[in-house]
Every structure is written in structure tokens, then in C-alpha cells.
Amino acid sequence: DIGKVPDYWRAIQSVLLGEIKNVSIPGIEVRPGVYAGLNVAVNWDKVDITGPVYIGAMTKIEDGAKIVGPTMIGPNCWLCSGATVENSVIFEYSRLGPEVRLVDKLVFGRYCVDKTGASIDLQAAALDWLITDARQVLPSVLGEERRAIADILSTAD
């Protein structure tokens, strides 16, 4: 039973570090100690990744991101340019904004937890613009789309 955050954290790190025998990391080893699931969108030459790292399927990693292991990134995540993740666990559908730096953190939903179990409600702390749900349409993107549609409509005959 893994009932406490520090225990869960250590269990994931132990798997990534190869300390637990007969447990294999899913995906393909794309670099020594770096495993990726299906359809990971990344230019491997334009990111800085030091294993052990697992990147879940359908995750998007923008140029300039940095990942230092042991780190697990769940499926369908999005790391923006300049985001840094070290010694952390990022659960599915998490979006890390540009220049966000996470060290020794677990991120899931609107919560960020350190390895002692202390949590931060990102929405209540007004930090939800830094770490969000990757499935959400961001207001800035929506604003850009609105401007593009307005430009198209204004040039139509």
C-alpha cells in the first residue's frame, strides 16, 4: 500500500532508477535512460533531457524545455518552451507554462505537492495560469483565434 505522498514518490523514483527488479518502464528507450510512449511530440535535438525519465504517450514538449530525472511525465501533457522539470512526477493532462520550474514536485489537476506531502491549490494561489489542464483552451489562444476570425471576416466581400 502506497498511502503517503513520500512513499508514492519514492516508489516511482525506484522504478525509474532500476532499483525494483522485474518492473520494466513502458515505451521505447529513445536515449539512454529516456523512455517515451507513443506519439510523443518533441524535437529531441532541441530539448535538454537527462535520465532516468519517462514521457507518456501523446505528450508535447516544446523546444527549450529541460527535464532532469528521475522524472515521470504522464500521458497527454504539454511542456512549454523553457519549462524545467527536475526530480518530479507530472500526472496526465498537465500543462506547464513557459519558463515554469518544478523541482521535487508532484503535479496533478490543480494541485502541486512537494515530496513531504504539503500541497498548493494552484487555483486558490492564483498560479493556475502557470500549471493548467492541457485540455483547456487558454484565454490567450482564444483571443488570438478571435482576432484571426475578425481579420478574415473584415476582409470578406
Segments from the language model and where they lie:
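Left-handed beta-helix
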Residues: 1-157
